[in-house]
Amino acid sequence: MTVAIVDCGGENLRSVQRAVEIHKIKAVITNDKAKVSNASFVILPGVGSAQNVMQSLESRNLIETIKSLTQPVLGICIGMHILFDRSEEQDTECMKIISGNVKKFNSDKRFKVPQMGWNKVTFLKEQTKDLDDYYYFANSYYSQIINQTIATAEHSVPFTAAIQKNNFLGCQFHPEKSSFAGRKFLEYFFNKL
């Protein structure tokens, strides 16, 4: 079993790789189309901007490859954002795998933007209720709650903390920074998706 961690210009590649390897699964950081296509699992990590990630994927001709994958795919933070139609961040057109747009949080005295730190996540399906926990977030943008939302959190407004459409799973939080809760979430990705 191999996990392809797509190198799309993010900064959290090594921490995602270490989080995967805790599960005794080989993880390779790559932007090679064949390695991505042939991996058992694919992870789109994300730190940076949606526009930079999309440009990086486009320059490597990976967008259509990713959209055509049938194995489980996990998008983390911006990796989740790019699964949607658009992001308000630099008005970026994304991969259009999941219908909807990514919006920016409004800042006020009680809710700082970006959201940095631990937040309670509630999973919506009975088979994932054991994943309810606090997870680590670092985000200024969010997706509204839609039909494919499988977990929610709140930061000035309720928002999608995790989403699933077919073999594509996305999480707004960072499982690689979320300690035991993050390990359980990755276990769900590797064993239940």
Which role fits each region the language model picked out?
Residues 48-115:
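Cysteine-nucleophile active-site neighborhood
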Residues 142-193:
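C-terminal and late-domain segments of enzyme folds
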